[in-house]
Structure formats: structure tokens, C-alpha cells
Amino acid sequence: ADFDGDGRTEVAFVETPHIGGSLRLYEFRDRKLREDYAVRGFSNHAIGSREQSQAAVHDWTGDGVPDIAVPDARRSAIRFVTFADGKFREFDGVAHNQKIVTALRPAMLDGSGTVYAVYGLADGTIVAVRPNPGR
């Protein structure tokens, strides 16, 4: 996806999610894969867990550039981030007393067209968050 709005496709991933993970964006430029951004403090799965889908992509800010929802390094908060206009910005987040343990998915739940980030916590709670892009 074009995560920064520059017209080029980037690949987003969390490197070393178990030890102070970094959210990184790379793009193919000048016939090489080049790092565009690296921001520490993220995770997308727990050691030993088979769940490998703890991140979601959707344009929550409505600016035409995909945003990313991903847990913090401890997996006890969800962070909503954007790289629009070439700048990293965290525009919302929700902290929890339990770890995030399920996949994280964008979902329309009520027919209004609003897209929520949906995921589950270690105590069995299902969470649906509608991020506030203006925060």
C-alpha cells in the first residue's frame, strides 16, 4: 500500500516484535528495497503464539492514505498511526488491562459505513474501537 501518499508502494512490518519491536516501512526505489521509516514500540504477536495477524490497515483518517492499527510493544494497547505526507503521527490509541491475543481486523458492524478495529483480549473481552483521527 502507499502508506505515505508519495505515489509509491511501501511494505509495512514489525521487526523484532518480541524485543522492542519497530514498525518499519520499506519501498522499492532505484531497483533496491529501501527503508523509509522506522518507529520503535510496536508488536504484532507474542512469542509462541500462532496468531500472526495483530495489525490492520484501513484509511481511518479519510485522507486517502492507508493507516495502520497495531498493538504497542507490550500488546496491552492498540495504536492507530499514519505516515501521510511523509510524517509519522499516532492519531489515536486505547490502553487495556489485558493483553491483545486475537487477530486485529477492520470491520463494519452497524451498517453506517463506519469501520472499527476489532480484536480480543486475554480475558475473553471482544473490543471494537472507532478511532478518532482528529485526536
Where do the protein language model's features map onto the residues?
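Beta-propeller-forming repeat regions
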Residues: 1-135
